[in-house]
Amino acid sequence: SEGTRKWDGEPYDMSGWDEVYGLSLRKIVGDDGVKLPPPSFSTAIKISDLKNIDVIGIDMDEISFTESYTKNISTWQLFKRGRLEKSMTKSGIEGQTPEEIALNMESSIRGLSGFANLERERVKTMAENIRLQSGRQKKILAIIEISNVSDFVEELN
């Protein structure tokens, strides 16, 4: 949240996947509809700041993410993901709505077992952190990537 809060509006280096997603999304919504950082995050932070509401990250911290990444992602998985990204850069991502594009992109990436395992571990961490916060907070608004929502809800139940 701190990076989004302090972003100066200047262009920044995107990952290849952000670029592929943005190009595919642009075909549906046009140039003005593609925004990074995502408006859901930046708007939530602005409203939280105005109302003096804490913004708390629930995803893995950098150390946990790095450990999970190195445990789950092999060199072969990285190679396959690179080829997948290259292929999707050429052909785009199927979908008629931004949601379909996001879900189809994530589904393709998660077809690689290491990346699927990494996302499962991220979702588990997010659910654990929400449970921790629910003991401290009366109300919680969680902004979760659409590709993780169903697994996140399942993990909470």
What kind of region is each of these model predictions?
Residues 1-157:
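Compositional signal for N-terminal targeting/processing segments
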